[in-house]
Amino acid sequence: MIITKARDWARIRANLDEIGAKTVFIMGCGQCATVAGTGGEPEIMQAKLALEADGRVVTGWAIGEVACHLGGTRLETRKHVGDIEAADAVLVLACGAGVQTVADSVKKPVYPGLESVFLGNVIRHGVFEERCQMCGDCVLDKTAGICPVTTCPKGLLNGPCGGMWNGMCEVLKDRECAHVKIKQRLAEQGRSRVSRLAPKDYSAKLKPGSVNLREGRERDAKPEGSSASTGAGMYGGAPQKDCS
C-alpha cells in the first residue's frame, strides 16, 4: 500500500491563500490513506476543523472507495457536484496518484493534503515499513526475498559496506544489515549466491509508468492468423483465461 503522512499545514494554508480560497471541499480515500490513518473520516474531520480555524468554510466532504481509480472517483465527485461547485478549491487526503485522479475529475483547483512517502508493508496496525522501490528489475529471486535496493540505505547489491559492524547497519545503527539477513536466510534455505548481481538497470523503470491490460486482451482476441495475435499469457506461456 502507499504510505502517506500529513502535509505541513502551513503549506496547505499557503496554497489556499494563493488563490484566495474561502470555501473548500475535502476528498479522502477509503483504501491506503484510511488504513494509514491519514485520509479517513477522522482525518477529514481534523482537516475540517483546521480549515474552519483559518476562517474558511467547508462545503462538504467525501471518501472515495479508491481515490486513484478514475472511474470511481468521477462517480463519487458527481454525487457531490453541488458542494464541489460551491468550493473555491478541493483538498485531497490521498496519495499523489489520488490527488491527480481527483484533479482529472473536477474543474476546481485541487491541492494535496498529504505527502506520499513510500510503498509499504503493513507490519501491524499503525506500523508500516518500506520494502519495495518498484524498480522494474526485481532481484528477490536471488536475495531470498529481501530487497537490498530498499532495505540497504546505500542500495548495495552484492554484500555489506565497510561500515557494517557486528552485523548491524552503518547508517541505521539499530537495524541489522540487509546483506547479513540475506546471507542468513539463504543459508537457512540451503541456498547460496550463485553469481554477483549486475548494476541496477534504471531504464527498466521509465517515468511515467504505464500498463495497459486491455491491450493484451484485445490482441489475444484477434482471429487466428493475425500477425498481432500471439496467444501468449502474462508470462509468455499458455493463454490466460479472461475471468472479467
Where do the protein language model's features map onto the residues?
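Short, polar loop motifs at secondary-structure junctions
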Residues: 94-99
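ATP-dependent adenylate-handling ligase core
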Residues: 68-70
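Iron-sulfur (Fe-S) cluster-binding modules
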Residues: 1-65, 77-90, 104-142, 146-244
